[in-house]
């Protein structure tokens, strides 16, 4: 029998009034740094001010103070999110056609922005149907509002005001928990309590309350809406909540209340907690009863998970014990020491969270179209394309951020003296093998995937279609993907016998679902064209990983620069007199990784956009004949590079290029402007610092001549600053160009 020492009781976990509130520091730019606070000598000062303002590590080495600043900043972030949400709901209430859309979502487009006529820009107010003129929105808010049971613009107003109140509350909390009652370091490090509260509270009770809202408010209101009842005739949410008879008319088992729950006769509830699979044929979205059931189930899981970790009661798991027990046959000490890393070095913790959240965001992108969760979302092609693109970009940025903070952790926080033979140490010791193998994989994937396209272009150019890789000549069918599709399509009858349809129509087997003459979703065929582009995906993803992982594993030292850790996270080169050591800092790997991330995500969203227009989206005639937007040309056109240029980029750019004089003209201007921003980046990326310094000095000479020289000396951007400005404009220009291209196209044809 093991006698454990009693767990320590909870101590006082906050400091009262640690830092007095004062606005004086607001008037002192750079108050957090002795150097910057002195004020500007040269124009470099303003760059340093921005670079270090939120780099709390550089303000102090006191971990408790850093933790408090981060914690407080999180409340500020939440405040901004609530403010943004409030603005979205306010636009829905004040400037939108939400009530009209609700009454006829198949013929009326969603709009929540009306442009004021000042210099003729009211041309942007296009006709979205129902006699309303405004800018068509593609955020999916209307669909979410309908799914949650919002039936009037008054309800949107109330929610907007509520969000503003919450924004103010968050601002107050940020001030309060830094200036009035600041948590002690021990509170931030109490991971078991944190897990219990976040799992049971945020995820468990959050899901449970959403499930409750769905059952008591969303489901009945959506039942009425689907039956064509006028939104103004539908009872208000509180009437459903307070009056059980109203619900019992729609779902008879409601009359029995909680009795079936306590008598374990749960199947009584299967009217509104279903397990159907597939899509609701009326709205083209997942069955809302399936969604309510899902949230209830998730809530139970997380409520249980939120009681798993050991706090004051001496029962449950301890994270440190779990990690230290985690040893495999080939992993030495395993995760020993990881607990200390993750509870004291926040960059490591952040890196992990960014990697998980980034991956999750990309998973969301893929589920939003394959299992469209909201009513009338699947037939709103512009919104579908926007949601996919948005979540892919966000996921890409978060994953690069994960590598960035992993590298910062390696440079600033990793202590090699007390890490021996644990997992991280073992990875670092065979990093050469990892990176060289990964490099080989990248070369293999690059040559072979691109080589297949080049072969096809060559055969096509020589007029030999019979020798091309295509569905009609030499087939390269994606047999594994087709097998997975088939397995899922057959699941309802076999591995998931309770389901009536498979999780997603895209797997195959089922019929297509059309709403209002438009295809919502249908089985997606995969062929040679998909096989080719999937290998490009594999190539770009592996190269991104190669660059980012090399940056992390060689952040502290390399054969070229053994003392790299002393040079810091970002540095241009290893000092004067040592050639060939530029672009080796951990920061430079993030910089280079961003370009490949952009590359990878671009191919993904191009693939998605074209594939959906070619093989999924389109109209259906009364005879049941489907006409796709681009007539199924993906399979034959996307198998050559020339096809991508001619039939995707050029052919589909016609809408944005010809948008002048129409309500889509703003996209035409953005398309042009964003190209300019992108080109502007090349000026920073292709020229060196000396060129600009030389130019600046001659400009300063002219100012001196006229006696108008400023006191602050102008300086050229440092090498790192120039690269940062370059990559920012490159990504901003590239993403905005793609945005204008996609939206002008899909709003015009979708």
UniProtKB/Swiss-Prot annotation:
Any one GO CC term of the record: photosystem I
Function in brief: PsaA and PsaB bind P700, the primary electron donor of photosystem I (PSI), as well as the electron acceptors A0, A1 and FX. PSI is a plastocyanin-ferredoxin oxidoreductase, converting photonic excitation into a charge separation, which transfers an electron from the donor P700 chlorophyll pair to the spectroscopically characterized acceptors A0, A1, FX, FA and FB in turn. Oxidized P700 is reduced on the lumenal side of the thylakoid membrane by plastocyanin.
Top-level class of the enzyme under EC nomenclature: oxidoreductase
Annotated catalysed reactions: reduced [plastocyanin] + hnu + oxidized [2Fe-2S]-[ferredoxin] = oxidized [plastocyanin] + reduced [2Fe-2S]-[ferredoxin]
Lipid bilayer topology: Multi-pass membrane protein
Enzyme Commission identifier(s): 1.97.1.12
Details of cofactor binding: P700 is a chlorophyll a/chlorophyll a' dimer, A0 is one or more chlorophyll a, A1 is one or both phylloquinones and FX is a shared 4Fe-4S iron-sulfur center.
Residues that coordinate or bind chlorophyll a: 683, 691
Pfam families noted in UniProt: PsaA_PsaB
Protein name (record): Photosystem I P700 chlorophyll a apoprotein A1
Family that this chain belongs to: Belongs to the PsaA/PsaB family.
Claim: Transmembrane is one of the keywords in the record: yes
Membrane spanning residue stretches: 70-93, 156-179, 195-219, 291-309, 346-369, 385-411, 433-455, 531-549, 589-610, 664-686, 724-744
GO molecular-function terms, A-Z: 4 iron, 4 sulfur cluster binding; chlorophyll binding; electron transfer activity; magnesium ion binding; oxidoreductase activity
Record localization: Plastid, Chloroplast thylakoid membrane
NCBIfam families: psaA
Biological processes annotated in GO: photosynthesis
UniProt entry tagged with the keyword Nucleus: no
PANTHER family xrefs: OUTER MEMBRANE PROTEIN, OMPA-RELATED, PHOTOSYSTEM I P700 CHLOROPHYLL A APOPROTEIN A1-RELATED
Sites where the protein binds [4Fe-4S] cluster: 573, 582
Self-association state and partner proteins as the record states: The PsaA/B heterodimer binds the P700 chlorophyll special pair and subsequent electron acceptors. PSI consists of a core antenna complex that captures photons, and an electron transfer chain that converts photonic excitation into a charge separation. The eukaryotic PSI reaction center is composed of at least 11 subunits.
Chief place of localization: plastid
Residues annotated to bind phylloquinone: 692
Record key words, sorted: 4Fe-4S, Chlorophyll, Chloroplast, Chromophore, Electron transport, Iron, Iron-sulfur, Magnesium, Membrane, Metal-binding, Oxidoreductase, Photosynthesis, Photosystem I, Plastid, Thylakoid, Transmembrane, Transmembrane helix, Transport
Binding residue positions for chlorophyll a': 675
